[in-house]
């Protein structure tokens, strides 16, 4: 399963073109997260409308609690690296679920996901 970050959803909702995401959706390999839904819903009116139609239909990843998030931050020294609290929530969710990966275009979040061995690496076309 792949947890899709808001950076991927925003690009997809704007362009409608993300072949690998379409493929993952068809294979039912996509998860969303309540914080991703919230972030994407804060975009433009059209983006918000599309996000609120699509994302709630997808399986929702279990949300990590604050203690789990902070433990991951401390264990992997994720502070001071430009990775935000929402980002660390996504990382924690993925780390706590073996086999789950995180797909993002955010450079710092992707670097942290790589460090933790949970980065989804799309096939380039």
Predicted regions and their residues:
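Conserved nucleotide-sugar phosphate-binding/catalytic loop shared by glycosyltransferases and other
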Residues: 57
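Active-site neighborhoods of divalent-metal-dependent phosphate/nucleic-acid chemistry enzymes
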Residues: 12, 19, 60-123
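Alpha-helix/helix-capping structural signal
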Residues: 7-8, 35, 107-108
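Short, well-structured N-terminal submotif of metal-dependent ribonuclease cores
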Residues: 1-32, 41-53, 118, 124
């Amino acid at each position: 399963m792949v947890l899709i970050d808001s950076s991927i959803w925003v690009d997809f909702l704007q362009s409608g073109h993300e072949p690998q995401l379409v493929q993952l959706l068809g294979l039912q390999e996509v998860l969303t997260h309540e914080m991703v839904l919230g972030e994407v819903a804060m975009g433009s009116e059209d983006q918000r409308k599309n996000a609120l139609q699509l994302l709630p239909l997808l399986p929702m990843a279990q949300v990590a609690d604050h203690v789990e998030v902070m433990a991951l931050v401390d264990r992997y020294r994720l502070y001071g690296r430009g990775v935000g609290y929402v980002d660390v929530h996504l990382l924690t969710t993925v780390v706590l679920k073996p086999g789950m990966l995180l797909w993002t275009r955010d450079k710092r979040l992707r670097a942290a996901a790589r460090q933790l061995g949970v980065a989804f690496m799309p096939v380039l076309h």
